[in-house]
């Protein structure tokens, strides 16, 4: 039917390309031996992009994702903090992902890099509240668009909030399953810590990094799916898990308490006068700034935990309170139970009237 008809060279080339494409597709469909492969010179970049798309935020301040010292953070997002229960007090989580070969350990440089990221986040946060340089356009932009995050430094106790920081590495299940699995790594070092002073969790120089393994085949399959709901559900699940696992790690190392000053006790004045004894151990993470969080290292490296608790109990109501829990209900019960000891002021004591009676002999 097309005899004696003429076609341009471009049309013939297009026909040949289309024929080659559909012929190959047909052969692939008919032959199980023909497979497609993904070739990557540096698979770390591919894995990093997969994880960032699945757990990260994209609306990140430029000074955090691309830091002033030239370092580029792999993953960052805001989520509920470790030390509080309020949803309206988000904190930045910092992550680093690597596609490690089996048996490969995380190097010292990678750990140091994560600690540096955390220090930079702290400084960026403080600049939002303490730097008024109107000529710094980036700072003013961040203040306007990211000023909803709480201040990491507590002015009353001079303590610092805990920065969540983690490694996430790929792992293949032994049976090569696509099961959704993410867990604390089975390597020797499940977490890393860095501190200048012992027994000061709420110190600016006390930093931590946790390490998780994720089923590589699952995240690749999830990344490739055109299913926004599944991806969002996994993101929510993983963020919640990261927070809880870091809290578990901290709870294994520290005893956490909540404390509130006795009536007629000036908490701010007391903490200022006993600054050296409480520095790095006390922080105010709650909306009720009359309630403080106290963290003491279980190993008691200074050998004075009990002495400090005894002294603090002379001035504060103190209860056991797991990290991130709301202490208001329990501490209110303690205050109500004990307030009779503190209810009367000197003025009220002077106004008391003693009433009695004497039995008559008649």
Where would I find each of the regions flagged by the language model?
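Interdomain/boundary linker segments immediately adjacent to catalytic/signaling cores
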Residues: 1-45
